[in-house]
A protein has these predicted regions:
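Residues within the alpha-helical elements of helix-turn-helix
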Residues: 37, 41, 90
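Short acidic, hydrophobic short linear motifs in intrinsically disordered regions
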Residues: 28-38
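Basic amphipathic alpha-helical segments that dock to polyanions
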Residues: 49-59
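Short helix-capping/hinge SLiMs at alpha-helix to coil transitions
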Residues: 9, 23-28
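Non-DNA-binding regulatory cores of transcription-related proteins
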Residues: 59, 63-68, 72-134
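Short alpha-helical segments that sit at the start of domains
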Residues: 1-20, 69
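Short coil turns linking two alpha-helices in DNA-binding domains
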Residues: 45-46
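Short amphipathic alpha-helical elements of helix-turn-helix/winged-helix folds
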Residues: 17-25, 59
Length: 134
């Protein structure tokens, strides 16, 4: 059952609930955290969360942060660019950035090597500007 339109796309109830929970979160969330938050809305099993997350990734509405095993809402309409996530290891803040030159370099490298990427995400761990000054 489709219920919500997001960026011109119709989302199912579960997709809309997961997207809403991620949008309201102050940092990326894991699947089990999402499940706990959404139990009152009818989520009973991790598979429901994972299916919704997979579909939201396919719709380019969320990103999976591999190193954190967590998901976050896509902050921009840069679907051709490679997102770069700056992850603060002290406070847990995550910011999404885009760089056309970096994306072009990744595309060029892939083409030269005959590699066809499904997706590319870059994660940089360190300290954010607030924590580095502490």
């Amino acid at each position: 059952m489709s219920i919500k339109k997001e960026q011109g796309r119709t989302l199912t109830k579960n997709q809309a609930l997961v997207l809403g929970a991620l949008s309201a979160a102050s940092q990326p969330l894991g699947a089990y955290s999402l499940l706990e938050q959404l139990r009152d809305q009818g989520f009973k099993a991790p598979l429901q969360v994972y299916r919704a997350l997979d579909q939201l990734i396919e719709l380019k509405l969320v990103h999976r942060l591999e190193s954190l095993n967590a998901w976050t809402v896509c902050c921009g309409d840069h679907h051709r660019d490679t997102p770069v996530f700056a992850i603060c290891d002290d406070c847990g803040s995550v910011t999404e950035h885009f760089d056309k030159e970096l994306s072009s370099g990744i595309t060029s490298l892939s083409q030269r090597s005959g590699f066809v990427p499904d997706r590319s995400i870059i994660e940089i761990h360190g300290q954010c500007d607030k924590c580095v000054g502490v």
